[in-house]
């Protein structure tokens, strides 16, 4: 973890320090527990293909917060489409912070269900399920069909 992040964390009010944990690099085998415990995956990136970390978080039952208008990262609109996250209306730090607060309120008011988030996204994103959908699409195309 860069020293400036530790300094930033130490300057936070004590009540906020308890809610923000700087974990550094986390081994793959521990990621699911971290995602589930954190509840929210904040995606501040603008330039990633499908943001694998967000997909992993969804499968672990966490929700996603990110910028709305990002053509290079348009998967986020899909990731929040099933009561599983919030997008910021504008691409700015203030707007992203507001979306994060909105998502925290959604969890606090019971609008997010980690089991439902995980069940839904695992059914779509796990490798076996994805392969079945690709094969079905291929077979449908071979037969002249247009749907799955």
Label the predicted regions:
Residues 33-38:
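Short alpha-helical donor nucleotide-sugar binding micro-motif in glycosyltransferases
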Residues 63-72:
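Short hydrophobic beta-strand element within catalytic cores of glycosyltransferases
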Residues 41-42, 65:
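A short hydrophobic beta-strand element within the catalytic core of glycosyltransferases
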Residues 82-93, 102-108:
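Conserved acidic donor-binding segment of nucleotide-sugar-dependent glycosyltransferases
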Residues 5-25:
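Nucleotide-activated donor-binding/catalytic signature segment of Leloir-type glycosyltransferases, i.e.
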Residues 108-143, 147:
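A charged, aromatic-enriched C-terminal amphipathic alpha-helix characteristic of glycosyltransferases
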Residues 32, 55-59, 73-78:
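Short alpha-helical segment that forms part of, or immediately flanks, the ligand-binding pocket
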Residues 46:
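Aromatic "clamp/platform" in nucleotide-sugar-dependent glycosyltransferases that forms part
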